[in-house]
């Protein structure tokens, strides 16, 4: 087996996304964080620009950094979902706001999505 077969990526899928399946009926479609995904680079630039000095001097709070990361993933990485419900079992429409809420409420899910992206 070659390194190329292990690490070469599909540039089309990096942008159009892949489905992550959780349980029997929950699908979350994600794009790649980086690589051939120009939307990710643009969103990171736009979201972090107001905080660049804090980021560079490492004075940005952990809470703000985590919030920015959730917003970036909600806007540039998660492309959609199906079968996602809130804590009461009510269907959650895919919106950026709902994605940020889900990431904040379920940090282990967010960690998994970050690892997969």
Describe the role of every protein-language-model region.
Residues 1-14:
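Extended acidic low-complexity intrinsically disordered regions
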Residues 22, 26-117:
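Short, surface-exposed, charged amphipathic helix/loop patches that serve as local interaction elements
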Residues 13-23:
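Short acidic-hydrophobic surface loop/beta-edge motif
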């Amino acid at each position: 087996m070659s390194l190329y077969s292990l690490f070469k990526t599909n540039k089309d899928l990096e942008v159009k996304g892949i489905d992550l399946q959780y349980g029997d009926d929950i699908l979350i479609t994600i794009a790649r964080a980086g690589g051939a995904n120009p939307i990710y680079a643009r969103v990171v630039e736009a979201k972090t620009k107001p905080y660049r000095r804090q980021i560079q001097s490492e004075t940005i709070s952990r809470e703000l950094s985590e919030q920015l990361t959730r917003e970036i993933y909600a806007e540039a990485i998660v492309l959609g979902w199906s079968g996602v419900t809130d804590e009461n079992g009510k269907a959650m429409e895919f919106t950026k706001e709902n994605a940020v809420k889900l990431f904040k409420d379920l940090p282990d899910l967010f960690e998994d999505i970050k690892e997969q992206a």
